[in-house]
Amino acid sequence: MQEQYNPSEIEALVQKHWHDNKTFEVTEDANKEKFYCLSMFPYPSGRLHMGHVRNYTIGDVVARFQRLQGKNVLQPIGWDSFGLPAENAAINNKTAPAPWTYENIEYMKNQLKLLGFGYDWSREIATCTPEYYRWEQWFFTKLYEKGLVYKKTASVNWCPNDETVLANEQVQDGCCWRCDTPVEQKEIPQWFIKITAYAEELLNDIDTLDGWPEQVKTMQRNWIGRSEGVEMTFGVAGHDKTFDIYTTRPDTLMGVTYVAIAAGHPLAEIAAQTNPELAAFIDECKNSTTSEAELATMEKRGVATGLFAIHPITGKQVPIWAANFVLMNYGTGAVMSVPGHDQRDFEFAKKYGLAIEAVIKPVDGEVDISEAAYTEKGILFNSGEFDGLDFDAAFNAIANKLVAEGKGKRQVNYRLRDWGVSRQRYWGAPIPMVTLADGTVIPTPEDQLPVLLPEDVVMDGIQSPIKADKEWAKTQVNGQDALRETDTFDTFMESSWYYARYCSPQADEMLDPAKANYWLPVDQYIGGIEHACMHLLYFRFFHKLLRDAGLVNSNEPAKQLLTQGMVLADAFYYINEKGARVWVSPLDVATTEKDDKGRITKAIDKDGNELVYTGMCKMSKSKNNGIDPQVMVEKYGADTVRLFMMFASPPELTLEWQESGVEGAHRFIKRLWKLASEYIAQDNSEALDVSKLTSEQKALRREVHKTIAKVTDDIGRRQMFNTAVAAVMELMNHLQKAPQTTGQDRAIIGEALSAVVRLLYPIIPHVSFTLWNDLGNTGSIEDSQWPVVDESALVEDSKLIVVQVNGKVRAKITVAADADKDSVEALGMNDEHVIKYLDGLTVRKVIYVPGKLLSIVAN
């Protein structure tokens, strides 16, 4: 073997072997247990970042580990290749999104291969290809036929100057990113999929996701947001109109002092006809882009409509206010306001001088609402016939009365809204719907699919090419003129079913059910927790749609989910002559000074600028603190980068990028290489004979098999890859100190190295592949078996016992593994150190914890 570790040479040879032998290409095999390992596929932005590397290294470690368990392992890869960034890049680079995207795919594909990931490249997909989105379009038409798709108007960001829709990220400080025109809200028709039809199942089935993190499950439960309440009808004084309000706290109904409605509520529109102040307020609200998330922090404002609501039980009139904290697209667009028992309502009432009444008090005291609302559940008072009831009794009594009088109904509501899948962008899959000359809207016939997105286009940065090209929309259906839909799908559509397409990527149908049901569900899914409430929910929803279409037979798409943490790096900046921050790459920092705790106190870049250090931050372009994986691979090798990624932190926590840590990982690999080289250079013909081993040799062999047991558990069950690496490093320390004098010495080292290269194979596959063969093993390491623990090697001949005198450790003694209390006590009492500390004392008590501790109490 080569004496020196040369990563670039080794990795090129091993990667060529994998490519030539199609090592990771798999087919269905009913005789083997399958394992489907999947990392969330990347957007082809142009270059991999360290977040990608961490995600894909974790996936590769799991896949390679399962392969050595003898399983039929599928690990595919592809490209989430539609989306707005490609449009922006095309505008900036004066090209079209398609060539920019395909060039990026090729570049990033090469980067992935250089990192040694064991993907089945024969299954590669790109979601921007007609071969992929054709089946998405087909499935959408089937959902439409089942009544799960509908069209309605919804609000979008609208630039009146360019007359175009803007994505949220194209709105900067309320203005168009391109022309700085104030952005308006505009209602336009959009397509929706009825995810709410599956809300209950999506919620209930969270309980079956035993292999998913609790945090993700909690986030999804909250996002779906099931609540039990009452929907009641309020009248409007002086009008024959009514409106509905939903509440989960009907126990507070008797404390309603005003009603708040959305600016877009029909009652607000009516009142605004004679109320200029209200009309102006409505216009202001319509042109703001307030999201649900922003409601909690924004200033609460409102205008009285001049209308009064009639309380459904008391008949009392309460004022109706239009308020900016009520959204028309959430609930009924109206809320009953109980300022005595809701803090937001309390603050609004104080601001506008509205009445505040208390109707709930603690079980064991009085209520004080002079400074804040009392928001806990309690006992009703000031509530007429409901006085004295607790929450549950009041809920039922008030609900029953409303139902009996035809003024309300019990209702289960969900926070979850239907999925709006229309995007007014170009670079996405065209929505396969057409409008006939008579206005009828129908799905594109199957024989006209796919509806192709033209790729040879010019991006002007203003309007989608397929919206600008009036000829593109023209088509014929059954001999009739028709116009195609010019909106494209939300890119979450593509990422909601890609995992299933990998099972049969060349199939001339959406899925080959036999292949899909062999591989699905995914056994291990890996990706960031930021996807908990969007992608991961749509992912689950789409799987249920596929199931109900008869394409898959499982209820959930993935058994286990691992959410890896972010990768952080040092961030530095200086202030330039214009007073602006200039962020400096950590690679361009020339010198640093640190305090006694290792914290950076001073830094200077290569140009001599004194820098401000802001700490460890998420790697990002904005802070210029991203580290190019390719630079690190060229400098240290892919195995070193992979090893650092797995060792530096538990997978679900953030990882702090430290090049000193990378250097440490590199030194470890060189130590392993050196030990193997020294071993191979000797006469290793003597076979291991456990009956001939000395106690020291048995102890070393015990460490080998303890390490096998720990690493197997750490990777296979606990998924604590960092502690698995630490265990192998500790074993390596023992092996480096061990003698290689006798034949049995070397036989144990040989057994240990054979185990170590397999234990590390998932993490540093190139080195392991090479050393496996250099150590004289036949066949490829990919076809070997994971090392098995020899239970007999774990049996200890002796035990190390700690001896305490009056609670302080005074000695450590070695005893036979089966020694009884009397013999241990005798040895302990006769130890020279113990004798010294017992001098002049009388032993009062001796406690023995078998195999661990001998405690002597004396005075």
Swiss-Prot record:
The gene is leuS. The keyword Glycoprotein does not apply. Its EC number is 6.1.1.4. This is Leucine--tRNA ligase. Its main location: cytoplasm. SUPFAM superfamilies: Anticodon-binding domain of a subclass of class I aminoacyl-tRNA synthetases, Nucleotidylyl transferase, ValRS/IleRS/LeuRS editing domain. Keywords: Aminoacyl-tRNA synthetase, ATP-binding, Cytoplasm, Ligase, Nucleotide-binding, Protein biosynthesis. A motif ('KMSKS' region) lies at residues 618-622. The lineage of its organism: Bacteria, Pseudomonadati, Pseudomonadota, Gammaproteobacteria, Alteromonadales. Belongs to the class-I aminoacyl-tRNA synthetase family. GO terms for cellular component: cytosol. It is found in: Cytoplasm.
